[in-house]
Amino acid sequence: MTAQNIDGTLISQTVRSEVAARVKARVAAGLRAPGLAVVLVGEDPASQVYVGSKRRACEEVGFVSKSFDLPASTSEEELLALIDELNNDNEIDGILVQLPLPAGIDTTHVLERIHPEKDVDGFHPYNVGRLAQRIPKLRSCTPKGIITLLDRYNIELRGKHAVVVGASNIVGRPMTLELLLAGCTTTTCHRFTKDLESHVRQADVVVVAVGKPNFIPGEWIKKGAVVVDVGINRLDSGKLVGDVEYDKARESASFITPVPGGVGPMTVASLIENTMLACEQFHTEQ
């Protein structure tokens, strides 16, 4: 068997079109368009690329996008003061602070300062806690995007054994919670996991987010498994590859996300959905 590719570019465009229609309906009803504040500290080239794509996506769906590009010398106090200002701005529904932050700024302090109802990245402990208690509101963007992909492809998760490789706060941990919520029996693997291969070989669904090119050999993938590759790594040749050995894995898998064009576009689509949700649920009276 050869796996069917899960087309994240196509699904993300569908999600954006759905949000754009909701924005249009809001504006036609005399309500303001949703507003997203995007904060970038420093001049990290990769962060500038990510922020640019997020701002463009906002404008495409009709959001009001406010940009705050701060120098790398910005202090934590100055950044927290800006977040306080944005928390109190009634025309801002979502606040996104691009990570990583420069040395000297405590990321936890910054993320916890964002009001939970404006935390459209889904990183605030309150929102992660809601997901853990099975009452999610604003959900972490990449895991949410993955669940959307699987749902749009009608991939049944209930009763499946899902293995998540990687336990970061941004992907691995919230992904485990999302899969639990979807009815999976979940295993989370990390750097202390013994015999990673045996876990991956048992997986009906495997989600890999470690940031190491071709980290999971394709031969580990069980026949008929669903493979979600969150990694995006550039080889010396310039080629972009994921964390899973794609060509070999697709010989066994039933579905697989390609890199690029799989999970990546869905992260931004989820951010757009979260901002729309925050506007509709929390700030409708404005």
Swiss-Prot record:
GO CC, alphabetical: cytosol
UniProt key word NADP: yes
Known EC number: 1.5.1.5, 3.5.4.9
PROSITE patterns attached to this UniProt entry: THF_DHG_CYH_1, THF_DHG_CYH_2
Biological function: Catalyzes the oxidation of 5,10-methylenetetrahydrofolate to 5,10-methenyltetrahydrofolate and then the hydrolysis of 5,10-methenyltetrahydrofolate to 10-formyltetrahydrofolate.
Family: Belongs to the tetrahydrofolate dehydrogenase/cyclohydrolase family.
Reaction catalyzed: (6R)-5,10-methylene-5,6,7,8-tetrahydrofolate + NADP(+) = (6R)-5,10-methenyltetrahydrofolate + NADPH; (6R)-5,10-methenyltetrahydrofolate + H2O = (6R)-10-formyltetrahydrofolate + H(+)
Protein name: Bifunctional protein FolD
Keywords: Amino-acid biosynthesis, Histidine biosynthesis, Hydrolase, Methionine biosynthesis, Multifunctional enzyme, NADP, One-carbon metabolism, Oxidoreductase, Purine biosynthesis
Pathway(s): One-carbon metabolism; tetrahydrofolate interconversion
HAMAP family referenced in this protein's UniProt entry, alphabetically: THF_DHG_CYH (MF_01576)
Pfam families per UniProt: THF_DHG_CYH, THF_DHG_CYH_C
GO biological process: L-histidine biosynthetic process; methionine biosynthetic process; purine nucleotide biosynthetic process; tetrahydrofolate interconversion
Molecular function in Gene Ontology: methenyltetrahydrofolate cyclohydrolase activity; methylenetetrahydrofolate dehydrogenase (NADP+) activity
Subunit structure: Homodimer.
SUPFAM superfamilies with a match to the protein in the record: Aminoacid dehydrogenase-like, N-terminal domain, NAD(P)-binding Rossmann-fold domains
Positions contributing to NADP(+) binding: 166-168, 232
